[in-house]
């Protein structure tokens, strides 16, 4: 059986469905097909239980503001990520006004973001605050070492803590908790109501090859075992960990030399309703010296299907699957002659990561509780249950010196003719989804992106695209106020 489509999106998560929504707004006549191998959209990395749900805006995440050798704080990444997440919020607000998405409360809730440190890390947090507060993006940040104020914001931090321990927090009221899976499902539901948009669940893309200007995809219906050949002019691989094997099968030169390293996650989930109700914040700490960025601990209020929850983690683990429901053969089968040496080099250069993962795998319940007790000293083991989170594939690619290097961000790979794009990597991931998709559009729909029709539409969809909010305070206030009002988030004008 053969099916034709102008655009094929592989994977039914937040990435693919956001690209679909943007393309249908820019070119409503475009025929788009989404192929998802599982029973529903957004069941892997986008699922509410498989990620932290943090709207990453660098309001509290200390790994985005490293301390340099001279003691100063590098805030360049924080400024960038803050504006990237704003693009996502602007597009969601636009979609609510256009009734593409339902009310903001169905997928996004205001939750304050706090950074928290103790003892000898306190000077770092104060210096971070002093560096960030002059930017309009962080002007409303509050720093305090006052225990009474901290107790008001986050009472669990003080329960059972010694009175002499030095501690400090920064507080940002404008943080958020996001259900990325719900956004993907709402996009899928709304877009499917119109002709020219098809979602195929239980459909696995097994292979893809290029013939002339057309991609031929080998697809199997995993329920009926019917095989199909699907033709497409443009293919986006947005299947989380499943994107990497398909990128390899595509054969595009731009994908050669890349490797993927799978890392699993685990949460401690609070089962005590009294404790859950006491806490209302996402609180991020600082990774221990030598630990990778993925190890940053955080104590998170989540709003999951309308119910308040409390999670702590993440604790990392290792298995060879690229997806939570994937195969143990995923990692070994991804090793090729063109990526073997870069992967070995990355392994040699990341011995601390290997040691960290071994420690995490061997961790006992008691050891996990000790990590939680840094945030909540009065925590008791019976109040918490361990639950596996999602699976991520960290990117390995050659650095500027040609040596394999482990990456902790998100990577967009496109073919030279712009007919295929693949998304690899992890954090900040879904929070910056709109910025990532704008990059895909720029690389793969370059001619259309230059037209006045697309430029005008993009200005309506994401008003701050290609504009620095820091350099135009009036525009900053107008854009952020309008977005905050639609999303029911707090906002104070600068």
Curated annotation (Swiss-Prot):
**Pfam short name (any one):** Mqo
Q: Which reaction does it catalyse?
A: (S)-malate + a quinone = a quinol + oxaloacetate
Q: Does the keyword Acetylation apply?
A: no
- Keyword Transcription attributed: no
Q: Name one GO molecular function term.
A: L-malate dehydrogenase (quinone) activity
Give the record's family classification.
Belongs to the MQO family.
Reported cofactor(s):
FAD
What UniProt keywords apply to this chain's record, in alphabetical order?
A: FAD, Flavoprotein, Oxidoreductase, Tricarboxylic acid cycle
Q: What is the lineage of its organism?
A: Bacteria, Pseudomonadati, Campylobacterota, Epsilonproteobacteria, Campylobacterales
Q: What is its EC number?
A: 1.1.5.4
Superkingdom classification of source: Bacteria
InterPro entries named in the record? FAD/NAD-bd_sf (IPR036188), MQO (IPR006231)
Name recorded for this polypeptide: Probable malate:quinone oxidoreductase
Biochemical pathway? Carbohydrate metabolism; tricarboxylic acid cycle; oxaloacetate from (S)-malate (quinone route): step 1/1
**For this chain's UniProt record, which GO biological process terms are given?**
tricarboxylic acid cycle
């Amino acid at each position: 059986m053969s099916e034709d489509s102008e655009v094929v999106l592989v994977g039914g998560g937040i990435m693919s469905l956001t690209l679909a929504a943007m393309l249908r707004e820019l070119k409503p006549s475009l025929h788009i097909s989404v192929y998802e191998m599982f029973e529903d959209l957004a069941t892997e990395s986008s699922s509410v239980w498989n990620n932290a749900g943090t709207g990453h805006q660098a309001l509290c995440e200390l790994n985005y503001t490293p301390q340099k050798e001279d003691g100063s704080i590098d805030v360049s990444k924080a400024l960038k990520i803050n504006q990237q997440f704003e693009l996502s919020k602007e597009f969601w607000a636009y979609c609510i006004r256009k009734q593409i998405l339902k009310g903001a409360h169905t997928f996004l809730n205001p939750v304050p973001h706090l950074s928290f440190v103790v003892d000898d890390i306190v000077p770092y947090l104060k210096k971070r605050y002093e560096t960030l507060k002059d930017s309009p993006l962080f002007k409303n940040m509050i720093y305090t070492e006052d225990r009474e104020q901290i107790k008001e914001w986050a009472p669990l931090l003080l329960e059972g803590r010694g009175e002499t321990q030095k501690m400090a927090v920064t507080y940002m009221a404008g943080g958020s908790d996001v259900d990325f899976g719900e956004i993907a499902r709402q996009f899928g539901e709304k877009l499917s109501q119109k002709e020219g948009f098809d979602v195929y669940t239980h459909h696995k893309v097994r292979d893809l090859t290029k013939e002339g200007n057309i991609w031929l995809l080998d697809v199997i219906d995993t329920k009926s075992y019917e095989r199909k050949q699907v033709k497409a002019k443009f293919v986006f691989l947005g299947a989380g960990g499943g994107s990497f094997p398909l990128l390899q099968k595509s054969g595009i030169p731009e994908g050669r030399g890349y490797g993927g390293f799978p890392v699993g996650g685990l949460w401690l989930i609070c089962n005590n309703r009294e404790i859950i109700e006491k806490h209302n914040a996402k609180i991020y700490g600082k990774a221990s010296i030598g630990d990778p960025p993925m190890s940053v601990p955080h104590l998170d209020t989540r709003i999951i299907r309308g119910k308040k929850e409390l999670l702590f983690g993440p604790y990392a683990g290792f298995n060879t699957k690229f997806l939570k429901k994937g195969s143990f053969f995923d990692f070994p089968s991804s090793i090729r002659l063109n990526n073997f040496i870069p992967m070995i080099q990355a392994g040699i250069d990341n011995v601390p990561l290997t040691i960290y993962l071994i420690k995490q795998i061997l961790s006992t319940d008691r050891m996990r509780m000790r990590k939680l007790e840094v945030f909540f000293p009065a925590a008791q083991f019976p109040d918490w249950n361990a639950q596996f989170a999602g699976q991520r594939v960290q990117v390995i690619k050659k650095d500027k010196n040609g040596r394999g290097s482990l990456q902790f961000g998100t990577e967009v790979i496109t073919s030279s003719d712009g007919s295929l794009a693949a998304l690899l990597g992890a954090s900040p991931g879904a929070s910056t989804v709109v910025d990532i998709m704008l990059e895909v559009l720029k690389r793969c729909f370059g001619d259309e992106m230059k037209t006045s029709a697309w430029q005008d539409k993009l200005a309506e969809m994401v008003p701050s695209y290609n504009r620095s909010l820091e350099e135009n305070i009036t525009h900053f206030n107008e854009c952020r106020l309008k977005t905050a009002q639609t999303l029911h988030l707090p906002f104070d004008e600068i």
